[in-house]
Amino acid sequence: MVDQSRIAAIFNDFMSLYLGRSGTGIEQLCKKHDYHRMLMGLLSNLDEAAKVPVPQVMKECYEVYKRYRNLEMKKADWEAIVEETRKLSEKWKSNKWCNRILVELIGLLEEDEAERRRIAHEVEQEMKEME
């Protein structure tokens, strides 16, 4: 499962770096977070990031992620996520940086869902073996 506190730390560390409040450089940040895909997404297309209010975009994107991160996802949930991310993308005029953040966050949700399905399958198999 995705370590939620790690994702929060990545967001906080990136924001500190972006706002110039951190003495940590990009390379140190990458090493600290083992080049995590979420951090790499935040660091990509920074020219595009400069075109939007980064703190607000990050807050709005992260709120979508937080809303769904602990759910056992149903089809309706996935449809809702797609709709919410579409609206955010539209709001920020399809900004490439914003879209990349949304894609990475959805990827994290997909990882969690795949892990939940794998665990459920293993439990089901163990139950069958016990019969």
Where are these regions (language model features)?
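Short acidic, glycine/proline-enriched loop segments that cap or flank alpha-helices
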Residues: A49-Q56, R67-D77, K91-W97
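Residue-level detector of well-ordered alpha-helical segments, enriched
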Residues: R6, I10, P53, V57-E60, ...
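Cationic, hydrophobic amphipathic alpha-helical membrane-interacting segments
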Residues: K66-N70, R116-I119
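Amphipathic alpha-helical binding modules
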Residues: D77-E131
